[in-house]
Amino acid sequence: VRLKILPEHKTVDIIRNMQGEYMTEAGNNYSEKKTQLHISVRNLVEFIFREGDIDTRSSRAMSADAMMEGTRIHRKIQGSMGKEYQAEVPLSLVVEGDLYELTVEGRADGIFTEDGKCFVDEIKGMYRRVELFEKPVFVHRAQAMCYAYIFALQNNMETIGIQMTYCNLETEQ
């Protein structure tokens, strides 16, 4: 199942806001070296948009088998996308604050151009009936939007779209 989303705005506000007022509120100018912080795009959006119970003991972690199966499906989908498809594109953005330097980083599953428009593809393999999805899972969309923002910023692009590719791990559809 592929869901294409063209940008409603020219930028993603999540990271833009981080570059602006949130990161510079401290207002202190210490001569000490800035603290270096690193976070993956996935961990950032999962933390920001976390829902549900604050007790995470009952949430089950993804099994090693499911992770291996997800990796296999990713590679299969990426391999079927054609020569113009760039797979596993590393992206990072450094956000400077007064007291620290935050590096937001990750890998876009794929980047491609279609009809003159650039898209970031976020692939998700899962044990759900993906054919019933009418819209992307919000946190998955947020992850793709962050990758798209970083890629667009680094390539001086005013617009960029995202594509969510969902695949059932059992049926491979």
PLM-predicted stretches and their roles:
Residues 3-118, 138, 142:
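Metal-dependent nuclease catalytic cores that hydrolyze phosphodiester bonds in DNA/RNA
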Residues 1, 77-81, 148-155:
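Hydrophobic, Leu/Ile/Phe/Ala-enriched alpha-helical segments that form helix-helix packing faces
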